[in-house]
Amino acid sequence: MFGSIIKKIVGSKNERELKRLWPIVEKINGLEPQMAALTDDQLRNKTSEFKERCAKGESLDSLLPEAFAVCREAGKRVHNMRHFDVQLIGGMVLHSGKIAEMKTGEGKTLVATLPAYLNALTGKGVHVVTVNDYLAKRDSDWMGRIYNFLGLSVGVIVHGLDDEERREAYAADITYGTNNEFGFDYLRDNMKFSLDDYVQRPFYFSIVDEVDSILIDEARTPLIISGPTEDSTDKYYIIDRVIPHLKKGEMKEVEANTLSGKKKEYTGDFTVDEKARSATLTEEGVLKVEKLLKIDNLYDPRHMEFLHHVNQALRAHALFRRDVDYVVKEGEVIIVDEFTGRLMPGRRWSDGLHQAIEAKEGVEIENENQTLATITFQNYFRMYEKLSGMTGTADTEAEEFHKIYKLDVTVIPTNRPLLRPDFPDVIYKTEREKFAAVIEEIKDCHQKGQPVLVGTISIEKSEILSELLKKQGIPHNVLNAKQHEREAEIVAQAGRKGMLTIATNMAGRGTDIVLGGNPDSLAKQWRRENPDAADEEYAAILAKYKAECAAEHDEVVKLGGLHILGTERHESRRIDNQLRGRSGRQGDPGSSRFYLSLEDDLLRIFGSERVSKIMDFLKIEEGEAITHGMITKAIENAQKKVEAHNFEIRKHLIEYDDVMNKQREVIYTQRREILAGEDIRGNFTQMLDDTIEDIAAAFAIDKVHASEWDWQAIVEAVYKTFGFQIDIPAETMDRLAPESFRKLLKESVHEAYEGKLASFGDELMDHLIKVIMLQAIDSQWKDHLLSIDHLKEGIGLRGYGQKDPKQEYKKEAYRLFMDMMARIAEETVEKIFWVQIAREEDVERMEEEQQQQAQKKIVFNLGEEPATAPQPARSKKSASRNDPCPCGSGKKYKKCCGK
């Protein structure tokens, strides 16, 4: 109560922020006549003037009013688009490193030009991040004309570019691209063998469009670069044939002589937990699988891999649905993005899940992959010196943005008042009744010519609805992952009179739905069909479409604008709001309503019991609908419950990934220093001394007399590592103290090293150290990632021993990291001492082969969304003594099963 009184007196934080920015808007408006009076060349020359002032130390904040006024004037001259006052506020919010929440149709694409132009004046590069290649290309071309007019260069990063094209795009003042492309380029750069081959510059300023989609919805999905293992794929087919013989059961509580008076009992061969997205064998199921696979004990260490793949096959059959989670296209399983409904070709689930689904669908199975490099979007975007974002819906996730990214959300007022009523939800008992009601409402709208956008949460549901509409003879467009190519075209015309569009989730996001139709889109379509037409003819067609669409716009406004019809609630309220936000843009009329049933996934998994009780209490008959505040409240509570659960998962993930992030930074920094030639010899000398120290500590033990040291093992270790026989007179052996032995060993090793250096020469030695060190780092880092994966899989069990799994993970991960650093030093030293002088062309060939090997057969994966942390693919191979132990303990093989 006290807080609300204070808020009334001083205003909310959002109101105070807007109040602070309005005087700057007035200042920009005051400069408008001055900028309008400049010629094109004079306006363009302002960019050079700003760059000089910036280079001399003037802050961007002091340049802001003039720079924004120049950019606004350029927008008017190039596109006849003038930034509104609220768009200037949006630009200032982005420049200050915050998130601007702007409703659909308020011109976010144009807003981004203001902070992008201002920050590009530093010459450090600005990245504008979009959700797909289409938007990256569209926005870089569309807004790029403004930047080019002002003398700035623009680049775009999309799938399929080679390194030279990428390097050129990143060198531009402003670079557009997708989050996946930016992230994978970072990982790829850190696998290269020359700084000249890097494509990215240091991270300065990033504007993330649809920031909620990228930083929240995709935060649980790590980017993974992986290489194939040599494992046979036969096991997936064998296990897949077992699954149909297993019966799904359930867990129930029965009376028992326990403290609670109840115990859990499982029926059937396996149980499914849809909330946790997991499937588990029961005791009966384990026995049946053992019998079918003809093995004696599924939990025997020899068969643990079978257990893992059986569980993944269960998940593939019980939890992953065709045309919902994936589609099968041309003999390939392609993932469907859960949040956007878009296909993600080339992306694969990890940890054997993708192979299990391929076996289930009877398509060719590709080998599992081993992780070579990985990063989460959370840690990628936190590398930018300044990060900002914009979206139509961020306020519901403001807490998460602040806690994880230290980003505040500012809600920007609309340019015109919102005229869209959002009608209460209508709930039915069954999905059949719900769809019947949806068809009736569509008929009503269609008869009067009102355009309708129907939102579904999966391809499967959009196709069911499409079939029902075909039976009724109602013409419509279906927009889902299968029609991805026509996405923008369909969405652009969804506001035309009588148009009915069915769309999955957020498909078409980024393209405005204009009432009456989009004349530019229609003219472009005509141009594609008539490529040889003269420019005059195109101009006449465009004018014709503009007149038609303007007249149709007025008709559609009278009919009530675009009606949004949601057929199911999403787990996140934000995504429901995004669907609603497609209507009522820039003061246009519109409306929205959601139709639900107790069979919908959200209500069935998270809230159906409570909602069902309310419906029974209100005596709702079959076929009868209910619109009640209690029901709406129960649904919102179910959504809040899921949102809180997902937030905890993302928070949990970043706490685990922060450990890996610090290790990744150390390795990547070390690689860059080696590539830059920074103190290569000094680094190697340190490795040499560390290796000498490790050998001395292992054999010359304090408080043990020298006569009892294992001299045979010492001689073998020195020979194996340094390639020479250590020469210690027999009469002095027994009298050596550990410190004397260290000194003697160090002198002998350094003498041998100096001999190598003399015969190789400084230049060749530096080159060899660089190549061998990089090879050792990449090889050991790959194995370390595998060890960390195994550690993550088993760390939860530490909780049963009254230990904090998170703290245990940090300790174990640190120990594994230090072991890896020791192995890198050991491998580098050993190879340098054993290497022989070769011709220069042999060394160059070795380096070239190494680069080709590293870049060959790499695969770009999206790791599966984990419950605790990403779990990239495993590989199985025979372990050498210093490799991570295959049993999954996280220890070296020699200190575990190899004892």
Swiss-Prot record:
Main localization of the protein described in the UniProt heading: membrane
One BP term from GO: intracellular protein transmembrane transport
EC number: 7.4.2.8
Protein name: Protein translocase subunit SecA
Reaction catalysis annotation: ATP + H2O + cellular proteinSide 1 = ADP + phosphate + cellular proteinSide 2
Keyword terms of this UniProt record: ATP-binding, Cell inner membrane, Cell membrane, Cytoplasm, Membrane, Metal-binding, Nucleotide-binding, Protein transport, Translocase, Translocation, Transport, Zinc
UniProt gene name: secA
Origin superkingdom: Bacteria
Purpose of the protein: Part of the Sec protein translocase complex. Interacts with the SecYEG preprotein conducting channel. Has a central role in coupling the hydrolysis of ATP to the transfer of proteins into and across the cell membrane, serving as an ATP-driven molecular motor driving the stepwise translocation of polypeptide chains across the membrane.
Residues that bind Zn(2+): 885, 887, 896-897
Record-stated family: Belongs to the SecA family.
